[in-house]
Amino acid sequence: TLGYVPADAAKISVSLTLEYAWADGSIALLADALGKTEEAQYYREKSLNYRNLFDSRTKYFRGKNSDGSWVSPFSPDASSFYDDILGTELARPYCEGSARHWRWTAIQDTQGLLGLFGSREYFVSELNEFMENSSNDPMALDSAGGFWIGNEHNLHAPYLFNDAKRPDLTQKWVRKTLRDSFGTDSGGLAGNDDGGALSSWYVWSALGLYPAAGTDHYRIGSPNIDEACISLGNGKTLRVIAENQAEENVYVEKVTLNGERLSS
């Protein structure tokens, strides 16, 4: 097989390839848990197929044809939303967004994704620029150049700074998004909630946690609540206490669990 969905055979080929790889990574973890060693290795290798669409020259995931040629012309800001309006196909390989939106989708292999950028510093610089160009527009017609909380392909993006050893930037951008992109009026969500996706992002982020989908790991952000008590469903509870939490106190000094300091 090619190891990717060819652009000349299917629309949204990049998005499909990236999400298939993510799903394969989750299957590998399940196989590990079941003691299925061979199956785990098979799906773990498949989960790296996302790399087949990463263009080392542009540092973006791009559509690739069956013969191995890149889809051209290419613009990282060409959006499928503009295609729908204008009747063009400049962003045909991407679902509900642009190459810039889908640039961060390798949740099953974040360190591998970092490596594709060439350096941690470059990755942080590009991701930070992406966050600086955030859009709160529910229609998303101006969001192709930056982070857009209103659609699911970006939900994890601010938490990737943790993987690049810059938790301060995760904390900065999560708190900014909580403050600027959510409200209590009729326009309180910056997009379609899509089965509770945006609402759950808010709840998790307000607690200072974010689940790494397909794993039992959680990333740490910056809570905007003073205290919360969560029922774990087994007779136990998780009590979250954020000391000195305030709008101006964004950065987390330390995190402890049952009195023991967590290292990451």
Predicted ranges, named:
Residues 246-249:
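A short beta-turn/strand-edge loop motif at beta-sheet boundaries
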Residues 233, 254-260:
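Short strand-turn-strand beta-turns centered on an Asx-Gly dipeptide
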